[in-house]
Amino acid sequence: MKVSLTLLATLCASLASAGVVITPVHQDQVVPAAQKVAGDCFFGVVTPQGCAPLRT
């Protein structure tokens, strides 16, 4: 049990440090359409930090 909990905590820390954690953003954090480049983001919307799902 302790080993699996340790592995899970290590995985979560690794994903968070790699910037893989997906945080929904608000409309005021989205890059305007005129500044986007085709293929910038295959899901969600483009933000200054990268791609993210839009919070509605």
UniProtKB/Swiss-Prot annotation:
Q: Where in the cell is it found?
A: Secreted
Q: What happens when the gene is disrupted?
A: Impairs pathogenicity. Forms pressurised appressoria but is hampered in forming penetration pores and fails to differentiate a penetration peg.
Can you supply one Gene Ontology CC term for this chain's record? extracellular region
Q: Describe how expression is induced or repressed.
A: Expressed at all stages of pathogenesis.
Keywords, A to Z, come to:
Disulfide bond, Secreted, Signal, Virulence
Family that this chain belongs to:
Belongs to the MC69 virulence factor family.
Describe the function of this protein.
Secreted protein required for appressorial penetration of intact host epidermal cells and for pathogenicit, but not for subsequent biotrophic and necrotrophic colonization of leaves.
Instruction: Spell out the subunit comment.
Output: Homodimer; disulfide-linked. Dimerization can possibly extend to multimerisation.
**Protein name per the record:** Secreted virulence factor CLU5a
Q: Look up and give the organism this protein is from.
A: Colletotrichum graminicola (strain M1.001 / M2 / FGSC 10212)
